[in-house]
């Protein structure tokens, strides 16, 4: 009896990963031996990993690297160039309106091809791909993920700096998961919009 092939590629080494050796984290496949901290190469567990732009770290070094630089733009090795995967319009008009099994990771409602954005193996409505704290619109280069909860870098840095660690960020993330209703991320406030413009180098006229 021969084993059937698989199209799954490890998110770290980009080599084929078979079911018996596969870990699926945030919708992405990994070899068990590749699920390691990028900084110290220590083996990671579901309970002790953090992710920045798809790059894995143990929580100890994720916190340490932030303290050394004061932000997440330094000392972090850049991950793979990963642009949001916008689903192409199907060639047949009828297929545009057909059913789909994809659920938005933020609101858990059905997401159709024309309104879908895909990041780290998760599907989102374009309108749901926002910071869980301030509601800022995110891009593939401006988001941080902690236990599958999305943040913009500005608010992720801000939440970290409040107490020097992200224990309270995890508590807030868990609270959001258990809250009833699965509401959408908050709309950005005026202050948040101004901060986002300043970060992008756009000034008010």
Swiss-Prot record:
- Which stretches of sequence are listed as region Disordered? 177-205
What Gene Ontology terms describe where this protein resides (cellular component)?
cytoplasm; cytoskeleton
Composition bias, Basic and acidic residues: 194-205
Q: Where in the cell is it found?
A: Cytoplasm, Cytoskeleton
Main location group: cytoplasm
Task: Locate the transmembrane regions by residue number.
Answer: none
Q: Found in which tissues?
A: Predominantly expressed in flowers and in pollen grains. Detected in vasculature and roots.
- Any further remarks? Cross-links actin with a constant of dissociation of 1.7 uM.
What is the designated name of this protein? LIM domain-containing protein PLIM2b
Organism, scientific name: Arabidopsis thaliana (Mouse-ear cress)
Q: Which gene encodes it?
A: PLIM2B
């Amino acid at each position: 009896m021969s084993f059937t092939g698989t199209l799954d590629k490890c998110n770290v080494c980009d080599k084929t990963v078979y079911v018996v050796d596969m870990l699926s984290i945030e919708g992405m496949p990994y070899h068990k031996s590749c699920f390691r901290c990028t900084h110290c190469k220590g083996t990671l567990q579901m309970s002790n990993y953090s992710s920045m732009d798809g790059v894995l770290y143990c929580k100890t070094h994720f916190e340490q690297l932030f303290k050394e630089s004061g932000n997440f733009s330094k000392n972090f090795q850049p991950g793979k160039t990963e642009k949001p995967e916008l689903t192409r319009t199907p060639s047949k008009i009828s297929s545009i309106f057909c059913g789909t099994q994809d659920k938005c990771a933020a609101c858990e409602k059905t997401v159709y091809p024309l309104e879908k954005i895909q990041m780290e193996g998760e599907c989102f409505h374009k309108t749901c791909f926002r910071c869980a704290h301030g509601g800022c619109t995110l891009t593939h280069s401006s988001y941080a993920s902690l236990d599958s909860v999305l943040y913009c870098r500005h608010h992720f840095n801000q939440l970290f700096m409040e107490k020097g660690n992200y224990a309270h960020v995890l508590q807030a993330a868990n609270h959001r998961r258990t809250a009833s209703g699965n509401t959408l991320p908050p709309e950005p406030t005026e202050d948040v919009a101004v901060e986002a413009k300043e970060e992008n180098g756009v000034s008010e006229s």
